[in-house]
From Swiss-Prot:
One of its GO terms (biological process) is intracellular iron ion homeostasis. The keyword Metal-binding applies. InterPro entries: Ferritin, Ferritin-like, Ferritin-like_diiron, Ferritin-like_SF, Ferritin_DPS_dom, Ferritin_prok. One of its GO terms (molecular function) is ferrous iron binding. SUPFAM superfamilies: Ferritin-like. It holds the Pfam family Ferritin. This is Probable bacterial non-heme ferritin-like protein. It comes from Haemophilus influenzae (strain ATCC 51907 / DSM 11121 / KW20 / Rd). Keywords: Cytoplasm, Iron, Iron storage, Metal-binding, Oxidoreductase. The gene is ftnB.
Amino acid sequence: MLSENVVKLLNDQMNLEFYSSNLYLQMSAWCDQQGFEGTAKFLSVHAAEEMQHMRKLFTYLNETGSLAVISAIEAPAHEYKSLKEVIETTYEHEKLITSKINELVGKTFEEKDYSAFNFLQWYVEEQHEEEKLFSSILDKLNFLGEDGKGLFLIDKDLGNLSTKA
């Protein structure tokens, strides 16, 4: 049985994953409007992955006899100055998710809820991969620059990444 504190944190995380899905889907719409079709596809695939993360938490809460509570989700920003701003925003958002997962893992360990602690290890590993991915995309963008050729190459690369996911 999960404690009230852990249930609240799991529900908060579930709703944050839901927001993440909406954020990446909205970013994909902006990218599509700007002609960054590869990035739009990549972010759309990533939005679906975030929804899977949300569903995993939803299922876990219900399987443990707790109630998964979906809250009102704030609308994400829909305007960006550049592709670089989109990528920087995704990277910063993933760092926020990591900090929230770490807080949740710490709380489960503190409360000696080893089942929840074990369940969350998947998210710990996933966040390591997410931060690494978005950091490397940002590094490439900084290296290639924001001129036409650099943006073309990044967009093409992200489009290729979306087919591997």
